[in-house]
């Protein structure tokens, strides 16, 4: 007859032995890490140095995490809070008196009083784009400097240093605004939503936010988006559209070149018409999604004319569509278009007043 009692005792002993081995192993690890009774002086010093190193490493990791994850977030919140407070501040007579001659938008006087580089205010309804715009002596002044002149990796939204903002309200034909889109999700972070790899999703975003407002000290204006582009800036990738160099048009040919290139390269068509003499607003920010260096997302909008509606009708928004074949640099064509050559233009030449249709247009051009 089996001795069940001995079997139970044997099993219990095995469990106790396993538990004891685990405890001994844990104790051995602890003894190996911290000074213990019976350790030699050299062993104690070694363990102390090791523990200090571990603590220093942990502190360094926490500092790095704070610097790159939490500090930018704090900077964003503090910056936006200060800008909001400044915007809610009623301008004083002294601040208004400091404005340039013929400035009419006195609500911006507090911003100009703090920073004379202030040239306007940019906003897009429904998204986190609602910021002051500055203009430096060059296009690097505000890359890592906030509105108050303090160091910030977020920088500030700034106008091209060669853009003109006259006290008559006149501006350059093409006003270019640059901004970062870092992980803090401010400035131009949401501008990247206009051009994601998921273009259908971006089209829906465009339909919800098709109008940009940019007010200077001398006028208030709205702009209708007609082009959303992915732009290459490196010659090694092939075709480069040097849009930052185009601030004015010497003649109709230069105007036609700029507007037609914007339509050729646009991911979407919104049907906005253009004519020589129109003014444009261009938003430019870095692009990181396609996997190439120095790519840009560029959004171009045409200024609303006198007497024109400053919004799109529901019917117009429904007609927004994707470009069947976007003009891109060689490397993008190789990566995303199976190496196929650009097939030609699918936009309506009537969108540019006086533009002549030629063989580059496809028969399926948009209405």
Predicted regions and their residues:
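Solvent-exposed, non-transmembrane regions of membrane-associated and secreted proteins
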Residues: 59-367
């Amino acid at each position: 007859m089996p001795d069940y009692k001995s079997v139970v005792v044997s099993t219990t002993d095995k469990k106790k032995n396993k538990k004891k081995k685990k405890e001994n192993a844990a104790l051995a690890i602890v003894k190996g890490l911290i000074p213990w009774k019976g350790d030699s002086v050299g062993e104690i010093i070694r363990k102390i140095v090791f523990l200090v190193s571990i603590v220093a490493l942990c502190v360094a990791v926490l500092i790095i995490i704070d610097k790159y994850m939490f500090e930018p977030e704090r900077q964003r919140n503090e910056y936006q809070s200060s800008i909001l407070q400044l915007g809610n501040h009623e301008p004083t007579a002294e601040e208004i008196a400091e404005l340039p001659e013929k400035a009419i938008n006195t609500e911006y006087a507090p911003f100009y009083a703090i920073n004379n580089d202030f040239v306007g205010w940019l906003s897009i309804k429904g998204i986190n784009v609602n910021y002051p715009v500055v203009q430096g002596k060059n296009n690097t002044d505000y890359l890592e400097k906030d509105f108050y002149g303090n160091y910030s990796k977020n920088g500030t939204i700034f106008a091209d240093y060669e853009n003109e903002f006259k006290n008559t309200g006149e501006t350059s034909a093409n006003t270019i605004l640059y901004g970062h889109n870092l992980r803090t999700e401010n400035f131009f972070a949401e501008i990247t939503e206009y051009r994601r790899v998921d273009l259908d999703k971006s089209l829906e975003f465009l339909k919800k936010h098709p109008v940009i407002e940019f007010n200077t000290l001398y006028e208030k204006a709205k702009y209708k988006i007609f082009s959303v582009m992915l732009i290459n800036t490196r010659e090694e990738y092939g075709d480069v559209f040097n849009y930052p160099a185009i601030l004015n048009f010497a003649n109709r040919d230069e105007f036609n070149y700029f507007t037609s290139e914007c339509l050729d390269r646009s991911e979407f068509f919104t049907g906005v018409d253009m004519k020589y003499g129109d003014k444009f607003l261009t938003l430019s920010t870095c692009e990181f999604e396609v996997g190439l260096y120095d790519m840009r997302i560029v959004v171009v909008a045409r200024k609303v004319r006198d007497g024109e509606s400053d919004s799109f009708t529901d019917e117009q928004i429904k007609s927004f569509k994707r470009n069947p074949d976007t003009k891109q640099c060689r490397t993008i064509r190789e990566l995303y278009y199976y190496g196929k050559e650009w097939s030609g233009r699918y936009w309506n030449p009537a969108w540019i007043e006086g533009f002549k249709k030629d063989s580059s247009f496809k028969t399926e051009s948009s209405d």
